[in-house]
Amino acid sequence: MKEYKTVSKVAGPLLFVEKTEPVSYEEQVSLVLADGTMKRGQVLDTSEDLVVVQCFETTTGLGRDTGVRFLGETFKMPVSKTMLGRILSGGGKPIDGGPAIVPDKRLDINGAAINPYARGTPRDFIQTGISTIDGTNTLVRGQKLPIFSSAGLPHNEIALQIARQAKVPGSSDEFAVVFAAMGITREEANYFMADFERTGALERAVVFLNLADDPAVERTVTPRLALTTAEYLAYELGYHVLVILTDMTNYCEALRQIGAAREEVPGRRGYPGYMYTDLASIYERAGIIKGLKGSVTQIPILTMPGDDITHPIPDLTGYITEGQIVISPELHRKGIYPPINVLPSLSRLMNLGIGKGMTREDHKKVSDMMYSGYAEGVDLRGLVAIVGKDALSERDQKFLEFADAFEDKFVRQGSDEDRTIAQTLDVGWGMFTQLPESELEKRIDRDLIKTYHPNYRK
């Protein structure tokens, strides 16, 4: 194997190598320091007289005397069923003190988006135990449903709660969680590890942790390692896999940092012009393949810079994914957990996974009525601030009280409270006792009211 010593420049995480034989895009590179230490890298760009290599580790010690060896293959992830229960670094190395992974296969981490013709229709309900998701923004198997948060909000706690509680009710199929955290602090990493071990959720999970002080380049690899693992578990071993990626904002910042080091022409707010395509190459790896037993469902979590939903990261994510769950600073200030605002939240595939035989026959009607009642109550709060509560009609006051009850009884729940879909819908019916039946009948069939309304239950 040839070793080149033609490094012309080191800029950030990048090495510029001159006069090499033809190499491939994304080819793996071994970097040999003067003291014999080896570091990993990958070909980022190539032309006739220059190759750009990104280093997966710190560039300390790299210089003109660094040896560069091109390995002739792309980054491959060693995968095995024994990965379940393991905690790995953002680069795929075990950090839980356990043995190295003995692979059944080595798979290219870049994978490929599912052929649209081969895609199955997502339809099976995934129960997260969180009412605001299960009841009004239902997650279905094979969907990609992001969570939009802001700095200082409890998105990490929500992510862990989903990882602990997610299941497909009534199904005997094997279920697994792949959890990938990018750009987190060491304190957050310890919190994640302790929670997984405390609750026993680690037994059915594979965890990847990329720390804030790890190289930015590794951050661009972490979600691909997680998805490669998920695809192996799903399509080769038949698992139904939920992939949680947090925080995609840190991933996009790494893209911007690498783009700046390459002196690329920036796009919106300094992010690379290809960020949409790059995000799509991650999100579109969710889904179901016809004829195969398993599935990959994604929940990417991102923090919106400045709580701005029009920022390029949430904006582009919204174009690719199938809805969004929005975490509200206002609800968080009220001390409500989880502070999920159902009004701007949406699950575009919800109707495929709910109803008779999947959740319950009243699910759609109850969801619509709760959404409508809460929206009207929130609008009335603005009116109360101007004219006062006493100026409202009796009907309007009931909707105002319904909005308060919705936040206090439906949205609010404990971080370890795992509600079934039946419990979630029954909470909704319990709140409907505050509204006149004439209002309920505008959206809910009379026979459903007589079946589920507490006033008619014996």
From Swiss-Prot:
One of its GO terms (cellular component) is plasma membrane. Has multiple subunits with at least A(3), B(3), C, D, E, F, H, I and proteolipid K(x). Keywords: ATP synthesis, Cell membrane, Hydrogen ion transport, Ion transport, Membrane, Transport. It is a peripheral membrane protein. It is found in: Cell membrane. The lineage of its organism: Archaea, Methanobacteriati, Methanobacteriota, Stenosarchaea group, Methanomicrobia. The keyword Heme does not apply. This is A-type ATP synthase subunit B. Component of the A-type ATP synthase that produces ATP from ADP in the presence of a proton gradient across the membrane. The B chain is a regulatory subunit. GO terms for molecular function: ATP binding; proton-transporting ATP synthase activity, rotational mechanism.
